[in-house]
From Swiss-Prot:
InterPro entries: Dymeclin (IPR019142)
Lipid group attachment sites (N-myristoyl glycine): 2
Organism superkingdom: Eukaryota
Modification sites for Phosphoserine: 347
Keyword Aminoacyl-tRNA synthetase applies: no
GO cellular component, one term: Golgi apparatus
The protein's name in its UniProt record: Dymeclin
Similarity-based family: Belongs to the dymeclin family.
Entry keyword set: Lipoprotein, Myristate, Phosphoprotein
High-level lineage: Eukaryota, Metazoa, Ecdysozoa, Arthropoda, Hexapoda
Source species of the chain: Drosophila pseudoobscura pseudoobscura
GO biological process: Golgi organization
Amino acid sequence: MGINVSRTADLGSNEWLQRFVGRHHIAHDDEAFWNGLLNYNIVLPENSQDQLNLDSRLETLCQSFIGNNLKTGNFGSLVTVFLEKTSELLSLSDQESNMHVWQTFNALFIIRTLVKYINETGSEFQLLQHFEALPSAELVQAAVELQQQTPAESATIAIEATEQAAAAAASAPVFVDGAKFETFIDALVNLIVVIPVKEFTYHLHLEAVNMLITLLSVHLFAQQPTEKSIVFRTVFKCQHANVLMSALLHFVARMVEVPHTMFGSSSAGSIVFGIAESLLSIFTFRKQQDVLKASNAVGGELSLQFRTHYPLANQSLLLILILTNHCTAQENAYRASLFGCADSKDSPKQGTVSFQIDFSAVYETLCRIVTIDQATLLLYLLLHRNERFYRFVMQQQDLEQLVIPILQTLYNAPDSNSHHIYMSLIVLLILSEDEGFNKNVHTIMLKNITWYTERSISEISLGGILILIVIRTIQYNMLKMRDKYLHTNCLAALANMSGHFRALHPYVAQRLVSLFETLARKHTRLDAQLKEPADSAVFVNVVTTAEDMLQDLSVLEEVLRMVLEILNSCLTNQLVYCPNLVYTLLYKRSVFEGFRSHHAFQDVVQNIDMVVGFFSSRLQRVQEQRGELGVNEVLEVISKGASQWSSDRLRKFPDLKFKYVEEDAPEEFFIPYVWTLVCKYGCVHFSSESIKTVTTDIAC
């Protein structure tokens, strides 16, 4: 079987492509032409430079296409060929469909390349014009005669017909009713959801997902709102939102590794998919996550590995985020579908179920890749809006598999972008809304946490390391980001957990009190500066005005108050289980002196003073009997005293319970963030020079 292999280098001079973008109409049933055009192998661009090289080699062909297609309608013919091949695929056996899959992929790749070019250089209306463009009657007649004549005769006929039709076709408007475009979208969805993912169909599924992303990228290049976009309206009125969302989430959960060859072909170009390769396909498709497990990569490095080895999962994840974060002000069937899915191992009795999926597979995959932005965003959506998935996660016995990677993202804050830090903290806040979670994290013990380098800790609870990382994030934010909302989310998570603090590691107790101490020193400095005369040196720096300092002081007092309430909540509810915290408070009692008479803090400090006074007097009595006490002896006295302590002595405060509430107009945050991730970590590389509506310089 002879196969024409077209490499990137010779695409610009390919005779079939030149005819396709030329001035002659090519009918969709011209099998000789389409077989010639679609019999090529191509290495897909792997990065922006590859895409740039491909774009530059195709530039002349694309310009010819733009100049001629509205007259020839060849793009519409290609779309029709794709529609026919997609329809035929559903009825073919594996062996019969290999060549079909290959040609369908090639047709779709050409369509995507042209759609991308039109998006980047034209308008959405022009894109739809090219989809719907029909050839003139003269060109159609010439194409019919072309198929019937000898090469010499056909060339003469085509030239004559082209010259006769050129003037009329150039001025005739192309009417856009969107019918072919809608049919094309439906075919893409059918391809994704109906055809099973096998080794030789993997790249076809990937190309279909990439095609949808490329179509929706019209948002990047248009200056109109998506509510007015015909592309968005067509995609979002799709009747099959549930099955598409189900397929995409299954692609993510299964994390199938990209096959070593495309369409089951060997390096020699054979398209035979034999028994041996079938067995190899089954074997390689089951060997999941080995690459990522072996590397132990996180963050940006993991994102690149995920894109390279699991492109279908990566692109499906990005498409899920696009579909669920756009059009949130009105009914969004994709969003409702994701939020309404249920575990396939359950039989939900309440609420509408959009589709069922193995939550265990989703959970395990998210645990593995949650250090990448797009996975954190998906986890956020599922936890925040899918109650069934939230309950499922809360029942897991290995919560450390999910929480530790999130903590690593926060720990590596200088290497993470602010959006990712923010979303990771929100996920922790949502998790901390569950009392079961707050109890369980202190029963899960961890050993030898090598990535935490501040101090060597041989053993600590998951709750303990969580507290340490959140405190560290607060301190990092104070120095670098100064984001009030970041402080709020950090403290809200700690506050939710505080009533369940147990068996705190000595270092955790020290860091909790040290956090207050650090904030207290800053408060004292700011307060002193504000009380200095207005003409003193403190105001020489015009950037820091008195108003700025007053605002800083107000925020600082809110944070200090919250830290005191967190300490008070722990002492009120868990004092008997937190001897190390009591020990640290006794040792650091002086840090509270300046706040006993402060109107904003005195009621909470009074409780802490009462606890410190109770244990201090007991220690004093024991010391009078035994002399100086060692650390273990002090802890023994605290433990005995705790058994006799009654929290009824303390002033009552409301329980600390905070719930995450999404801000107004969340799309203003999420849409630019999602498209930044698509541009940075996706397999489709767009021209950054042409992007108008979304800045892609968010540090990812």
